[in-house]
């Protein structure tokens, strides 16, 4: 089925794939893929997070990795804070650069739990932008906060 999807120009969201399925998908489809809500296993060893090799494969094909705010995917003890968010961003930037990262918060899967320092009564998008602006250049934050996803969609989903 994946090879047929590739023939039709359909890209994949690899966020919920097992490691084996991830590599098989990349073998069967030459298209860029997106991990809409995944973090980095090197920072938090959870099987839903991407290995460094997976992240590099996504970036090498022009794909995008959406950073997830679920505490259990940010920190191995499940109690995350804004420093954990920054650790994943730092790792992603050093590994794949700022053109392969995006927001992919997956807040509907958090059961109402957010990283400490994130106020659920305010715009989460705006709060994370503020957090990133405290550490990274505006151009990097703009890419992560939306430009990268827009470019991916223009190049792969919108005809």
Residue ranges of each PLM-predicted region?
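Histidine/acidic residue-rich metal-binding segments in metalloenzymes
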Residues: 1-34, 47-62, 83-99, 126
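Outer-membrane beta-barrel pore domains
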Residues: 76-82, 111-119, 132-135, 143
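Active-site beta-loop-alpha junctions enriched in small/polar residues
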Residues: 10, 15-19, 38-41, 70-72, ...
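Acidic-and-aromatic substrate-binding clefts and catalytic sites of carbohydrate-active enzymes
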Residues: 41-49, 75-80
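A conserved active-site cap/scaffold subdomain adjacent to cofactor or substrate pockets
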Residues: 59, 64-74, 79
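Conserved, mostly hydrophobic/aromatic
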Residues: 12, 37, 65, 106, ...
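Short acidic/histidine-rich active-site segments
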Residues: 69, 96-118
